């Protein structure tokens, strides 16, 4: 399995610019034969959510997300970090969505939100409720997603 780790410098609050950059990264990765492109936490929004004046959360079926999923529709799966809107913006999660063949397969909502030093995620997000494995590569493999602080938890 070839995995591309997309190291991108996201622009805080600039969804369209970040989506355009992600599209370039996906095209380049797919052209090299990658099987999976993985983007960082909150890569589509930038991490500094608290500094933004407006809510930029989006649902996993947002047209920009679907566009990116289709860009990888040449045999590669893609995982994006984004602020997920639910219930008309009343619930916002720090999420990662996995797409394959242009379709949403799984959304992981960050479970363990830090709230110390410069990390104030609990002020902006609700924690997810569970973590589970999901099929990748046409069901030939299974994977699970952890977002940053989730990986430091011994129970996971």
Residue spans for each PLM region:
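A short, N-terminal amphipathic alpha-helix
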Residues: 23-33, 64-74
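Alpha-helix N-cap and loop-to-helix initiation/capping positions
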Residues: 17, 21, 55-63, 91
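Catalytic metal-binding/acid-base residues of hydrolase active sites
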Residues: 9, 43, 83-85, 152
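Short, conserved loop-to-beta-strand elements that form functional interface hotspots
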Residues: 74-86
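Active-site beta-strand/loop signature of hydrolases that rely on acidic residues for catalysis
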Residues: 18, 26-56, 79-80, 150
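Short polar catalytic/cofactor-binding loops
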Residues: 7-13
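Extreme N-terminal starter segment of soluble prokaryotic enzymes
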Residues: 1-5
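Active-site catalytic loop in hydrolytic enzyme cores
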Residues: 60-63, 87-156
